[in-house]
């Protein structure tokens, strides 16, 4: 028995002869390539996650204004599947720390992060969130990575919406390359989640090798 997939436009012209089939036989392999997708489960899960990152609606300072601008029609963040702003951390898997993090605000941020869905990601946006910025004082946390695992750092004071969107694209690339996007693996001591490497530690050697530094005017462009 031989068969193939066909469309109405594939029907041969003219009357059908006795004993002939009106379905054109193009070969099983050719039709299978058009309608069958072969992949691995972890690649499919990673592809779905990187294109449906749901950020939590949270802001601290002027950097939040730049992040909110990226949702407007001029920048159209919906192109990357991250336009679904959630009002509850229990429905989000991304939090953007945009602004100055004070000592009194750190426990609140930690609690919001703990309530987020897993796997969850953190983007540190702006100089204040990255390293405290110009506020080198007792009341400001000198970098949100002191108490939260940061996946992407977006520099600037404040960074433009384009910079935030580039950081989001870098995060999507990292999510798509995860070898085990299901997070939990079977280890020698039972089911556990492997520890993720810090992006700051991975890129430290490259930053230390830099010999040419740009001027502040070039950085803002």
Swiss-Prot record:
GO terms for cellular component: plasma membrane; respiratory chain complex I. Transmembrane segments: none annotated. InterPro entries: NADH_UbQ_OxRdtase-like_20kDa, NADH_UQ_OxRdtase_20Kd_su. Keywords: 4Fe-4S, Cell inner membrane, Cell membrane, Iron, Iron-sulfur, Membrane, Metal-binding, NAD, Quinone, Translocase, Transport, Ubiquinone. It catalyses: a quinone + NADH + 5 H(+)(in) = a quinol + NAD(+) + 4 H(+)(out). It comes from the Bacteria. Its cofactor is [4Fe-4S] cluster. Its EC number is 7.1.1.-. Residues 1-25, 195-221 are annotated as: Disordered. Disulfide bonds: none annotated. Residues 195-204 have a biased composition (Basic and acidic residues). GO terms for biological process: aerobic respiration; electron transport coupled proton transport. NDH-1 is composed of 14 different subunits. Subunits NuoB, C, D, E, F, and G constitute the peripheral sector of the complex. Belongs to the complex I 20 kDa subunit family. This is NADH-quinone oxidoreductase subunit B 1. It comes from Nitrosospira multiformis (strain ATCC 25196 / NCIMB 11849 / C 71).
